[in-house]
Amino acid sequence: MALLEICCYSMECALTAQQNGADRVELCAAPKEGGLTPSLGVLKSVRQRVTIPVHPIIRPRGGDFCYSDGEFAAILEDVRTVRELGFPGLVTGVLDVDGNVDMPRMEKIMAAAGPLAVTFHRAFDMCANPLNTLNNLAEFGVARVLTSGQKSDALQGLSKIMELIAHGDAPIIMAGAGVRAENLHHFLDAGVLEVHSSAGAWQASPMRYRNQGLSMSSDAHADEYSRYVVDGAAVAEMKGIIERHQAK
């Protein structure tokens, strides 16, 4: 049966995902940046309360995946922290200036991760040659690749995802970006073994007092009074679709 991973930005969302049938959580901060490394406090609280597998993302900033020496040092430190806290896996990725896997740095990440299952995130979708990249990641023992098939959403990239699946058994190809209940059957019919979804929506802040003329974001038009949360009903619906597909 296909595995359902839910992207979560808080402990509350991780618990919601777990309670509604998620098989695994990708734990992130900063949804507007596409997911950054969670704080130590969030990591510890999730580790204590969530019982399904949780894979934190290790990404020090938004933007591209070619990092300075200081940023890469932080990545390695965060990998070690996640390992010490007892998480079963993590999500990360590094590229060089030419859009290839940064091989020396990826080797260091894998050494720091040790027995943890490593997912190479959507840095894969920014690489220059996906098949060569997949071969490189297989050599390192990367467990899975999260990809939209190098398109803006995974449904548009489904043909590339199928090509990657046909390329070999490892790493596992996990489809993500725009995967929802209404299009999930396309991925299941294509033989995708793991799917990744945020399964959520922006929720209004409970604050009654609002200073509407002020923003804490560099984007002056950002909505400071909303937050992204997992929708338990959406998770349950996706899980039900997967179970019914398996029963066919």
Curated annotation (Swiss-Prot):
Cellular compartment(s): Cytoplasm
GO MF annotation list: copper ion binding
Gene3D superfamilies: Copper homeostasis (CutC) domain
Keywords linked to the UniProt accession: Cytoplasm
GO cellular component assignments: cytoplasm
Keyword check for Cytoplasm: yes
NCBIfam families noted in UniProt: PRK11572.1
Subunit structure: Homodimer.
UniProt similarity note: Belongs to the CutC family.
Protein name: PF03932 family protein CutC
Organism: Escherichia coli O17:K52:H18 (strain UMN026 / ExPEC)
Gene: cutC
